From Swiss-Prot:
This is Segregation and condensation protein B. PANTHER family: SEGREGATION AND CONDENSATION PROTEIN B (PTHR34298:SF2). InterPro entries: ScpB_csome_segregation, WH-like_DNA-bd_sf, WH_DNA-bd_sf. The gene is scpB. Homodimer. Homodimerization may be required to stabilize the binding of ScpA to the Smc head domains. Component of a cohesin-like complex composed of ScpA, ScpB and the Smc homodimer, in which ScpA and ScpB bind to the head domain of Smc. The presence of the three proteins is required for the association of the complex with DNA. Belongs to the ScpB family. Participates in chromosomal partition during cell division. May act via the formation of a condensin-like complex containing Smc and ScpA that pull DNA away from mid-cell into both cell halves. It holds the Pfam family SMC_ScpB.
């Protein structure tokens, strides 16, 4: 084999390696969850050892202080995660996005639950004047409210209350830290006048 041919093979190998790394990075980014190394090997149609080797190279390339992400490998699964030192900024973004993702109905429902908890869906519907099923479902899915028992009346309706996630979401130490409703109403009426 001549020297030019060997150099071309080496270039092709580096190019293929970089392509695999690019694909792995895309898969990890889009997944958001750990991906089994075996599954990556299947997707890439290559051996698990090769994927592990590529992952280790990628992991080392993310080590620099100027990088905001890193590769986490645990129990033969791999995930792209943010570096712990950036967590405060990531949390700010997530709080902003969650607030933006709550509909007006969900925010109204959440306010009622926060101030009147524990409260039933029927009581929420009466206060709002419309059904709140979808808003309650959304808040349950986001773990901002929870079922916290049943009312001891016929039919035993579910009681809803806020979660620890609710407190974190609004930066509160406890449920008692919620602004006083009467004070808010007085302030609101002053602003309207």
């Amino acid at each position: 084999m001549n020297k030019d041919h060997e150099e071309q093979l080496e270039i092709n190998e580096v190019s293929q390696k970089n392509k695999y790394k690019s694909i792995i990075e895309s898969l990890l980014f889009m997944s958001g969850e750990p991906i089994n190394i075996k599954d990556l090997a299947t997707i890439l149609n290559c051996k698990q050892d090769k994927v592990s080797s590529l992952l280790n190279e990628m992991k080392n390339s993310y080590v620099g202080k100027d990088r905001g992400i890193k590769i986490l490998i645990h129990n033969r699964a791999v995930q792209l995660v943010t570096k712990p030192e950036n967590s405060i900024y990531v949390e700010k973004l997530l709080k902003t996005n969650v607030r933006q993702s709550l509909s007006q109905a969900a925010l109204e429902t959440l306010s009622i639950i926060a101030y009147k908890q524990p409260i039933t869906r029927v009581a929420i519907d009466e206060i709002r004047g419309v059904k709140s099923d979808r808003a309650i479902y959304t808040l349950l899915e986001k773990n901002i409210i929870k079922e916290c028992g049943r009312l001891d009346v016929p039919g035993k309706p579910i009681l809803y209350g806020t979660t620890e996630e609710f407190l974190k979401f609004f930066g509160l130490d406890s449920i008692e830290a919620i602004p006083n409703l009467e004070d808010l109403l007085k302030e609101f009426s002053k602003e309207e006048n």
